């Protein structure tokens, strides 16, 4: 079917760096003929674009059957990048073919990732089937036009189609020289399985006869039935299951297991059955006009951009600002032409471990969707090496070329048609956290990338995956292993079994941990996959939909577990004689593929030498310091182990909740007189001092920022029925029940988060601030006596006026003076405040006269700026996100336009009043990568986050520098 109109003979083009100097004259050597060519000349392919330097070995092609066959081995050494077409703003259709293209890898926003990389592969001389890309702007215009092709676009598409037809000497709808097409989507950001694909477009009752005459009946009718299935599902909205049902019945009737065992006559009959599905489902015939098929397929791909599953994937992954999807239309090449054909997907390195070894799968006599969709369980690449050694050797060489060119680990789709290799797609491969770090470190060692580039190769979320738990004792569950599948995404997961995506989401919303068990996953399952702790599938391979999506999210996944049978209707999982019901617990080891009965204990992971090396590079580049929020000595030790440069927030109230301390706290709350309160605080003093000593010891030589008591006092009271609370407090404190009730009523507030808390407690009860300050200074002096370098910083919370801060600073400094007199020596310390009330940000210059440092409490600052109660926001925030009123949860991702501007203003005003002012942030946003970037640009000195998010913040701070 496919052939080249002009045979190309071997040609070598040699260029020099002087090409772009002066007249740009260079020499070509073609079959011994020397010619001088200037930049104004056009190359033989009709292109104005020249390679920069190096050598290209083109290949000789000949016509053979329906495929393109290689007579001389292809090699591509140099890496030219084509200049974008002159009027890109108006151009909506871009063509590409081997050795030439109208696009390049830098045009992803316009051509989508797939289209840009196809153009790039073609331009560097790899064997890419000729095709065209319809731009993302055309998709945007289609949506604006009410889901109609914009004016003039169809004519541009037909012009591009003529390019494909001329290139290969075949025509759409011509039975004597049939051209079949693939129609694929491709957004600027990879979204696996989110968009729809149609293969073998152009077949009808007449064309299939012509194709059969050239390529054999079995191949022709196998291609036709696949097209009917895909076109019906993607374009016409007929469920794939209706076609699958016909196929399964046919295999059952013929007594065969695989599709490949069906004869040509069987497939002919199946084609007619598939046509009847159209009539039954839609009440109309299958559209036989190939150009109408093409138009409908393009519209279907554009429509898929706005499908529920695509919207959900973008929402989950916070993908915004894209124009739409591009459409890639290519000449078909076939992996289902017999035992010398096949299709595969590979990564140039292992995406799970990062090992420098090709990692992928191959199916003999199959089409690409069979591998990617997980419909058939494939074999590893050694199968291809055995059966097609020449094609395999060329594939290995192409992988090396692409890694050198893109300077990254690549995800590649390819097809072999009668021993001829075709490259169908390449993109930067998704990888696990472990894989990302090893690949980055190895590529620096190999000289492929600089350290600054390597830092950009690891996403902050990758480090989050590395900090996920593993099984505590894998040897302890060996007897409970009930099945084993493919280890598609590493890590460990424990949860209750559910069988549908909807159930996974529902159970997750109730606070349950679930394992989603499916025969195979589809893009419609992404919501449930995201909600699940792990994913287990009976079918599919290491590059199936489930595997790719799970790896991208860092979720444990076992695929192709053929020992299990999923009965979704009865909600049971069958493994031999074993039945596991919905809701029962299983565990999964995604690193080994083991499915384990019951709940297994999890343990935190250990940091690898590669990670330590990588993080040392990040630390050397970043300017922003990273501190940790830690409330106990154990937290402080973990923080330091993870690279924290100090404690940015130590919440003293968390020290009060121990069983031996809470009674004293409650006595203090019930106290009526200052003397009663002091008596209770005297009991708490040694506890606080001991905790501070442990934290100072753990953070020897690093600053420790301690926040004075912040929450409303009612949070320390027991929960439950009021009568029971009163009785319990009366027994604990020795206060009469009526007095307890009276005290509780006085503590009751309509809006406690804006009430009696923070510095208001210390101002009303100065003895509370005195006790905490004494505990800090006594602990600091004691540790200093033991040779520990202590750097205490005391932080006053919820300040809204300079007078509030001034009052508390006076109390603290008086206590310090007393303690230092008692101890006979001093300790250097600072007093500062949290900026969490908008008014404090607005008058930061006045606040800075009293404060030696600012720490933005972004949780409360966000709450008060938006007027959203964190405790109640769940009632409406999901609606706001769904309707696009907000793009992100402002309590997770900093609102840079509002809250962010307050932070910038306060920083500038504060430093204007006190140039030495130290400024940081200690809210949850300190661990959010996108927010960390903003804080660095705003000129903050540090961020503080939970101990286990410290590595993520360290990397995010470095990536701001190299962005």
Swiss-Prot record:
Keywords: ATP-binding, Chloroplast, Cytoplasm, Kinase, Magnesium, Metal-binding, Nucleotide-binding, Phosphoprotein, Photosynthesis, Plastid, Pyruvate, Transferase, Transit peptide. The keyword Transport does not apply. PROSITE patterns: PEP_ENZYMES_2, PEP_ENZYMES_PHOS_SITE. Its main location: plastid. GO terms for biological process: photosynthesis. Residues 1-76 form a transit peptide. Mg(2+) binds at residues 836, 860. The modification Phosphothreonine is found at residue 543. It catalyses: pyruvate + phosphate + ATP = phosphoenolpyruvate + AMP + diphosphate + H(+). Substrate binds at residues 651, 707, 836, 857-860. Isoform 1 is expressed in leaves, flowers and siliques. Isoform 2 is found in cotyledons, rosette and cauline leaves, petioles, flowers and siliques. The catalytic core domain alone is sufficient for the binding to PDRP1 but not for the binding to PDRP2. The reaction takes place in three steps, mediated by a phosphocarrier histidine residue located on the surface of the central domain. The two first partial reactions are catalyzed at an active site located on the N-terminal domain, and the third partial reaction is catalyzed at an active site located on the C-terminal domain. For catalytic turnover, the central domain swivels from the concave surface of the N-terminal domain to that of the C-terminal domain. Formation of phosphoenolpyruvate. May be involved in regulating the flux of carbon into starch and fatty acids of seeds and in the remobilization of nitrogen reserves in senescing leaves. This is Pyruvate, phosphate dikinase 1, chloroplastic.
């Amino acid at each position: 079917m496919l052939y080249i109109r002009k045979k190309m003979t071997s040609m070598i083009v040699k260029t020099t760096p002087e090409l772009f100097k002066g007249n740009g004259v260079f020499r070509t050597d073609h079959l011994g003929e020397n010619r001088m060519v200037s930049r104004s000349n056009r190359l033989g392919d009709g292109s104005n674009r020249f390679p920069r330097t190096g050598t290209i070995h083109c290949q000789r092609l000949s016509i053979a059957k329906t495929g393109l066959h290689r007579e001389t081995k292809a090699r591509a050494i140099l890496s030219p990048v084509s200049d974008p077409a002159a009027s890109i703003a108006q151009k909506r259709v871009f063509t590409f073919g081997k050795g030439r293209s109208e696009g390049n890898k830098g045009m992803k926003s316009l051509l989508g990732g797939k289209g840009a990389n196809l153009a790039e592969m073609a331009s560097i001389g790899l064997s890419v089937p000729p095709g065209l890309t319809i731009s993302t702007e055309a998709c945007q215009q289609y949506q604006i036009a009410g889901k109609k092709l914009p004016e003039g676009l169809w004519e541009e598409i037909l012009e591009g189609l003529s390019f494909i037809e001329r290139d290969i000497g075949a025509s759409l709808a011509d039975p004597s020289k049939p051209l079949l097409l693939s129609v694929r989507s491709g957004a600027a950001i990879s979204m696996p399985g989110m968009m729809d694909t149609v293969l073998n477009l152009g077949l009808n009752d007449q064309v299939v006869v012509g194709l059969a005459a050239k390529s054999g009946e079995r191949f022709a009718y196998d291609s036709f039935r696949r097209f009917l299935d895909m076109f019906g599902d993607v374009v016409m909205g007929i469920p794939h299951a209706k076609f699958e049902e016909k196929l399964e019945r046919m295999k059952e009737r013929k007594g065969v297991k695989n599709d490949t065992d069906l004869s040509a006559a069987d497939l002919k009959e199946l084609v007619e059955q598939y046509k009847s599905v159209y009539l039954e489902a839609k009440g109309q015939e299958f559209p036989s006009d190939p150009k109408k098929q093409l138009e409908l397929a393009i519209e279907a791909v554009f429509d898929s951009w706005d499908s529920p599953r695509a919207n959900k994937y973008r929402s989950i992954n916070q993908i915004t600002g894209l124009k739409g999807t591009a459409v890639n239309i290519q000449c078909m090449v076939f992996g289902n032409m017999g035992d010398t054909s096949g299709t595969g997907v590979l990564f140039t390195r292992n995406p799970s471990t990062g090992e420098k070894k090709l990692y992928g799968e191959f199916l003999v006599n199959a089409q690409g969707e069979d591998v990617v969709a997980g419909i058939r369980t494939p074999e590893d690449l050694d199968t291809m090496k055995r059966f097609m050694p020449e094609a395999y050797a060329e594939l290995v060489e192409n992988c090396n070329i692409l890694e050198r060119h893109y300077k990254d680990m690549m995800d590649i789709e390819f097809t072999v048609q009668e021993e001829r290799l075709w490259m169908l797609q390449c993109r930067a491969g998704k990888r696990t956290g472990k894989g990302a770090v090893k690949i980055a470190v190895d590529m620096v060692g190999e000289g492929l990338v600089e350290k600054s580039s390597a830092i950009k190769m690891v996403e902050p979320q990758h480090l989050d995956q590395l900090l996920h738990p593993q099984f505590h004792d894998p040897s302890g569950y060996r007897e409970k292993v009930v099945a084993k599948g493919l280890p598609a995404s590493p890590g460990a997961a424990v949860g209750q079994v559910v069988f549908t995506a909807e159930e996974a989401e529902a159970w997750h919303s109730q606070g349950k941990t679930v394992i989603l068990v499916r025969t195979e996953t589809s893009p419609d399952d992404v919501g449930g996959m995201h909600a699940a702790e792990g994913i287990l599938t009976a079918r599919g391979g290491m590059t199936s939909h489930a595997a790719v999506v799970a790896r991208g999210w860092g979720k444990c996944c076992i695929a192709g577990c053929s020992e299990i049978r999923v009965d979704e209707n009865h909600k049971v999982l069958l493994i031999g004689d074993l039945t596991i019901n919905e809701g029962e617990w299983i565990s999964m080891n995604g690193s080994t593929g083991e499915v384990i009965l019951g709940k297994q204990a999890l343990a935190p992971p250990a940091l690898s030498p590669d990670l330590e090396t990588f993080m040392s590079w990040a630390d050397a580049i970043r300017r922003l310091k990273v501190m940790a929020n830690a409330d106990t000595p154990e937290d402080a030790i973990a923080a330091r182990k993870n690279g924290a440069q100090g404690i940015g927030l130590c919440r003293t109230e968390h020290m009060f909740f121990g069983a031996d301390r809470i009674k004293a706290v409650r006595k203090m709350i019930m106290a009526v007189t200052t003397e009663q309160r002091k008596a209770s605080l005297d009991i708490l003093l040694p506890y606080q001092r001991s905790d501070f000593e442990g934290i100072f010891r753990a953070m020897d030589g690093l600053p420790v920022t301690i926040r004075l008591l912040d929450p409303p006092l009612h949070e320390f009271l027991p929960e439950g029925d009021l009568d029971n609370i009163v009785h319990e407090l009366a027994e604990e404190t020795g206060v009469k029940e009526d007095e307890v009730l009276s005290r509780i009523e006085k503590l009751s507030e309509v809006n406690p988060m804006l009430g009696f808390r923070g510095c208001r407690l210390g101002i009303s009860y100065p003895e509370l601030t005195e006790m905490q300050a004494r505990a800090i200074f006594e602990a600091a002096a004691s540790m200093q006596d033991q040779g520990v370098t202590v750097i205490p910083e005391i932080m006053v919370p919820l300040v809204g006026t300079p007078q509030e801060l001034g009052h508390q600073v006076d109390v603290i400094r008086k206590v310090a003076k007393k303690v230092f007199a008692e101890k006979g020596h001093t300790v250097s310390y600072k007093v500062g405040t949290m900026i969490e009330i908008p008014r404090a940000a607005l008058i930061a210059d006045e606040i800075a006269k009293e404060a030696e440092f600012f720490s933005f409490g972004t949780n409360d600052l966000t709450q008060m700026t938006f007027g959203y109660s964190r405790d109640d926001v769940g009632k409406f925030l999901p609606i706001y996100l769904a309707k696009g009123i907000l793009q992100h949860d402002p309590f997770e991702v900093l609102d840079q336009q509002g809250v962010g501007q307050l932070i910038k203003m306060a920083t500038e005003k504060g430093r204007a009043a006190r140039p030495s002012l130290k400024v940081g942030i200690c809210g949850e946003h300190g661990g959010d990568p996108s927010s960390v970037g903003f804080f660095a640009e705003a000129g903050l000195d540090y961020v503080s986050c939970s101990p286990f998010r410290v590595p993520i913040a360290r990397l995010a701070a470095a990536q701001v520098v190299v962005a």
